[in-house]
Amino acid sequence: YIVPSTGRAENMQPPQIEAEKRIRYYITSGGARVVDHSTGEIIHEEILTPEDSARMCRVFEGRNIYTEIAAGGKIYLEKAVADHLEQYPVPSHHVWFIEAGRQIVIDKPSRYFSENGIGIEKVNMYGIPAGLQQQIYDEVEHSGVAHITDPVGENMQFFPQGLDRTRGIRKL
């Protein structure tokens, strides 16, 4: 088998990857999930708890930041942002995904993940205003549950603290 190991969520794999029959397993979201694509079985998962997911959503929620939230193999967008995507810096290599309508739009991410008992795999934030960059970085880094893998800047992503891609590879 070919096993792609990527930062993308499962449903954000390009159609060319999904169509490749030799690809049975995905290592997704930087190692947060290992999935048997043919059966849907989750082989390995390192995610935030639903409560920690809700807390981390409050870091960006309502701040008009284009944010992709990966959870359960899917990408979620905050409705207030999704309703006006033309105003946000959607990465060019993600446009196909948005145009295909594969994202799930939710009103208030913190409430949604808490009420539905869903844990987050990772979060990508794009176009963070300069005045919020350090604050968001500090909030995530001092949360005790998540870690930003990028330097302070307009684009940052975070994962569950302690995530180790090699654990998923070894389990597979």
Where are each of the predicted segments found?
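Conserved acidic, metal-coordinating active-site core of Asp-based
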Residues: 59, 63, 70-172
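Active-site phosphate-binding/coordination module
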Residues: 1-91
